[in-house]
Amino acid sequence: MTRPMTEALIDSHDAALFDLDGVVYLGSEVVPAAPATMSRLRANGVGVGFVTNNAARATTVVADQLTDMGIPAAPSDVVSSAEAVTALVATEMGQGTRVLIAATSNVDDLARKRGLVPVHGADEHPQAVIQGYDPEIEWSRLEEAAFAVQAGARWYASN
């Protein structure tokens, strides 16, 4: 992109949202141009935000990682799929909805903050199941989630 094209692109937007893994960083390594790009955008008055489909990590953890990589970020600058799915369930089904969480404790914490009521088994009659990435999930939890969906609970999936 030529310099005039880049300036025109920056000047025509109030905000820019960036996916994280593969765009801002690769695993634990920052993409070399990312810190300077974010700085330049911010210096030109463009709001910078980050989106991730990683439901396993809290936005505080992600913001700390970005800051450590030379990209200052606050938790409010980061939106995760866990936040999106818990907000969706709370909006569609309302506070007080019983949800079976088949994901990391991050999703459980966000569900509670949104007024949802996490339960642990299909026998507690959850009205919804929220499934998300959890590298340590046990088959018994997936089984309970499947039983709940089979019994009529709405199934919400996140990465």
Where would I find each of the regions flagged by the language model?
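HAD-like aspartate-dependent phosphatase fold
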Residues: 1-20, 24-159
